[in-house]
Amino acid sequence: MMDQQKKRFFFNNRRFLSLFSAKRSCIFVLHSAVKELELALMKLRPANKMMYMRTFVVALILFVLAAGELKAQGWQFNFGGSKEDEGWAVLQTEDEGFIVVGFGESFGTDNDQNIFVVRTDIDGTILWTKYYDEGFQEQARSIIPTADGNYLIVGNIIGKPGERENIYLLKIDRKGGLLWSKQFGGAGNERANDVVLDSDGGFSVIGTSKNATEEDENILLVKFDAEGTATWSKTYGTPRKDEGKSITRIGEGYALLGNSRNETGFDNNIVLYRVDKLGNIIWERRIANSFREEGRSIITTQDGGLAIAGVINDNSDALIVKYDANGNQRWMRSIGDANVEEEANAITELKDGSLVITGLKLVSSVNVDLLVAKVDAKGNILWEKAIGDGEFTEEGRDIQATKAGGYIITGYNGQLLNTFNDLILVKTDGAGNTITNRVNGQVFVDRDNQCDFDNGESPLSGWIVKATKGIDVVYGTTNAEGHYSILLDTGIYNLKVLPPNRYWSTCSTEGVNVRLREFYDSLNIDFGAKAAVNCPFMEVDITTPFLAQCSEVDYIVNYCNTGTVTAQNAYVDLALDNKLTFQSASLSAEQLADGKLRFRLGNVAANGCGSFTVKTALDCNGVANGQTGLVSARVFPDTFCLDLDPRWDRSSIVVRGICKKDTVIFEIQNIGKGDMKERKKGIVVQDDIIMRGVNPTYQLQSGKSIEVAIPNPNGSTFRLFAEQSEGHPGRSLPTVAVEGCAEDGKPIITGQVTQFPENDQDPFVSIDIQEILSAVQSVALRGHPKGYGKQSTIDAKTDLTFTVIFQNSGSDTVQRVVIRDTLSQAIDPTTVIPGSSSHPYFLEVYEGGIVKITFDSINLLPANGGTAQKTYGFVEFRASQKPNNPTGTVIDNRATVYFDYRLPSGTNTVRWRIDHFPDFVRVLTSSQEVFVPGVKVDIYPNPFSEMVTLEVKGRQYNRLQLNVYDLSGKLIQQKFFNSNICHVYRDQLAAGIYSYQLISEGQLINTGKLIVR
């Protein structure tokens, strides 16, 4: 008997697919580890993200970044080939990525339908794709995570053309490996539509059972154990056609959603059963208010009730119905415009009790869009969105709320008048918005000065393309082939390419204006660049993950030439800390007379990069935890090829510092070719206090120098800052620190050196300075400089360096590591510069300033199965602050590390507060400052452990007041004395540096500092 149910006809609807194929004798799993297949799976239409799966050391791969508040955040990917591919169910995985199941026939070997599974990371980057083929036709309908961390796929299978249909069960691991497959069926046809995990580790499947000899179909419920063996089954229904659509757990039993053919035989009614854990009916409810009602999806809500999504009315409105646990209907809501068909296929609940559906909306007779709509907990419609391209049909099959507050949707789309569909994965924000317009293009060396891209013209990688619309700014970066791709909202944008330095010029200095009128638009804009100055521009970076006493330390040195011509005979000079001993290097090293090591790089082409490793050993003796180790690298040529500032007098200041017995000696030297025309000043900081009386001024002739001597350093850390003359090229900040200068056996103060930046603001200089640690966390974030004092204060012009350290603390080798770091709003994402790393990686910056770093094929051994070097990894990147950050701005930063498919691990948080240097540094003398003529104050011992004595000489006082402050200026002690000798006990003072004031009769006598051990 012909099914008389009403149909809607779409030219590309899946219902018209027919298949003819031979049977395969064994299950076939196609795993698209080959990147070409992964690219083929992604239909590169405007809604798709371009994927470049390469592993270049310090290679900037395609990224999308939104610096302003865009109207929509999200993406849409299409997976498929030239035949039928559809998505039916989606999950967000524990690593915050996604796994999608459905069916496809584009990439199998026998032209039939197979189960199709795609796993992506949080940004939609394909991790793997697989096909599962055990017969003539296989289709997946649902997927759930199992208790052991794997996944169960439930669907249907037909072994041979004309054979009956069975329920098909597959269990796969996190990498898509097949653990087992099983079938369930009898003499008739059994089909599955949904599955739910049970508390005993097993699972229950809902579907339909059709009698072999009759047309009657019933709702089928099957209980399976954890290994896929059926323990019992039951059917429910009427003498007419009944179909089981969705299942959810409620209490100790289940709620079953199905459709039952009404008495007219033309349309369905919705049927809802609540059953106990053995399948016995507790209550039954029906919705039969109009000619047509269909249930598609059911969930258990936070209040213990049930929510249903489906279709109502002949003209098809989307339907949401809310029940309590006893089957009492709380409310019913239909969503639909007059004369516009809408259907709901899936539903999800948010933390506030609101509900979101997905399905389809018939925009016109030839255009169907994906529907997303939200209602509050009482059923009031909050918003409704239609996502789709006028040239394509899109339908949402499943929806889940994401941890980020948006939604992930799967389904299918297909082009108008095209029989075949593609699986789609759509990510939206919390309002159902997504970005679908894309601007692509090429950035290249314009050798013929025609400003259009010709074959043979060299691509430029790592260049930033900026798109501006009002206050909204979006960025893209070119990949290794010079290609960029940016997702944009609608509107008028100015696109401009930003050269990495001033040695380059571009064809379009003012940019190109583009108008994006509609969604799913696509434009191609190429940018040519040429040399403004023929000069190399060398950059260098050196890093190691951490320093540990008496250990091997491997430094990674990266270098690049972002200039316009080849750097001839380039080399890197390396200076090691005296606590480090050179062992070997992956590049031949020359020992220089001054103790430095020289590594010859040869010729480095424009836009070329490279790296090498330097192995060292850190001393076992005479090294304290918290003490620093410093290594500096300088790459040559370091030529400055632009016009010089006319104010510059050709002087160039360098500073040096040494500990000589009981004295710290700083040297300031002019190594430039010109004499200084103006006097400049230096600042000396002892630990974290600016000294008075020793800060030098200088006006040096070429080659001349001065010394600054500081006696009796008492183990403190001293740092000198010096100024360059006005107009000095580059960003040089002459500074040097001397740490641990004390008599043998005397204690030293550590932890002070890294609070200030080093002189490596110029790209051709890199300084790695770290505190020696006794232990390292399995994931850690290090920020440099760490900032001054308890508030970690830095200047508004200080660049920040971030190093992420990670160790494989699991029991299995890790193949892939991803780091995601959401930058503070005070950091300029466009200034992110990738640095050294333990392994090859690629870096992306996108959305509101998320830095994503991916290590593919890292092969990181478990901590208990290899040496530290093979269990740890690290990566460094640098970024500048946004201009004019106001005083008081707080910069917080924290990274998340993803090891393969595990739960992500968060690092510590690093924090800074912005102020103006040197205003935020307390200003005191090296020991004290006396404000009363003829008075002297002796302090002994200082530093002290239990008690310190302050003895006033030169004048008799009857009463003295002593105020003790911490470094933030907070008064923490106040004491009074009736003689000129003041004994101050440590009491509860923690180790550290404190300032004090000595006062008598309202007059300030003396200020200074106390050092507590």
Please report, for each region that a protein language model flagged, where it lies by residue.
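A sequence-level/structural motif corresponding to short, flexible coil/turn segments enriched
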Residues: 71-437, 446, 480
